[in-house]
Amino acid sequence: MKQKIAEKFQTLFLSEGEFFASAGRINLIGEHTDYNGGFVFPGAIDKGMIAEISLNGTNKVCAYALDLDEYSEFGLNEEDAPDQGWAKYIFGVCREIIKRGGNISGFNTVFSGDVPLGAGMSSSAALESTYAYALDSLFNLGIDKFELARIGQSTEHNYVGVNCGIMDQFASVFGRKGNLMRLDCRSMEFEYFPFDPEQHGYKLVLLNSCVKHELVGSPYNDRRASCERVAKILGQEFLRGATMEQLDAVKDQISEEDYMRARYVIGEEKRVLDVCDALGKGDYETVGARMYETHWGMSRDYEVSCEELDYLAEVAKECGVTGSRIMGGGFGGCTINLVKTELYDAFIEKAKTAFAEKYGHEPVVIPVVISDGARILE
């Protein structure tokens, strides 16, 4: 990938630049907890974005997206926003840095990625983090890492129109090889936890169902509103920290649907902490058990699964897979699977054939390894 970028850069700009990279991410457990002030447990992965960049002495950005074979040129003022969707990410990062007082000028760049698009692995956050990190480095801006993550998040909010949380950008910037990060979405404190499945005889693999169910209304916002209603009745800002005893005490004051949503979130909060404890003991069986619990909680209580993802989780269980669950917001996308190495090939074969027989296409198999986040590539 780096070689192809370098060749295109040389052809377009007749020069060489510096290389920067950032990563996509997985979230092992802790789904729909971020907007409830809870914990998430992401890690950066060995798939991401690479960009070559050199300053060009103008106030223009000349950018080429290698995978799309598209070129864009734009200025750095608010009114200079490019038309191409992908270019808005780079423009947004530039604008967010400028808004924070960063003094930057034009540059030439070529980028490419191997994060599968639409698989819930945060290709957009990887792109934002690559450029935020690169511009901070090239212009010696001294921006702290949390602010680099916020620059990516603000880019989504203000230039892409996606009201995302901080987890994706956080994982992309702070990712560390062989570690997951437990992020407290209320205090923004975080802690690294060693996670090396290979060393313990396991593999981590995503199965992309390649299904995305278009939904009527805004189910994401509906789930969030349910949680906020219950938190308010409990007299809390967030559901974080609420107990099942407290929830059961107000059961007759809330709808059955709101009760189910809150039950899932309270359970998920505990599952994240259980998984952290289990990893400390090298107990991957407990990690896997909690993953299955999360899947069926998301399916039955939070109702964000779909038939195809439930089927993949069932196939995983039948094949003796240690843990499997929906990853991401739901309604399609991937399952994340923790599989014993000796069962891996048989599981993948079974998942592909069984899924294809039932739904007419194979799931896409994406093995992942926990890796470093944003960095300079030598």
Language-model features: locations:
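Gly/Ser-rich oxyanion-binding loop with an adjacent helix/lid
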Residues: 1-20, 26-39, 73-77, 83-196, ...
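C-terminal nucleotide
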Residues: 1-25, 50-83, 182-323, 338-378
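Short, charge-rich binding segments
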Residues: 42-44, 52-55, 101
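FabD-like malonyl-/acyl-CoA
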Residues: 125-126, 334-338
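Short, amphipathic alpha-helical segments that act as regulatory/interfacial helices
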Residues: 45, 94, 132, 228-231
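A structural signal for short, well-ordered beta-strand segments
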Residues: 109-111, 207-209, 335
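Short Gly/aromatic-enriched secondary-structure transition segments
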Residues: 37-44, 223-224
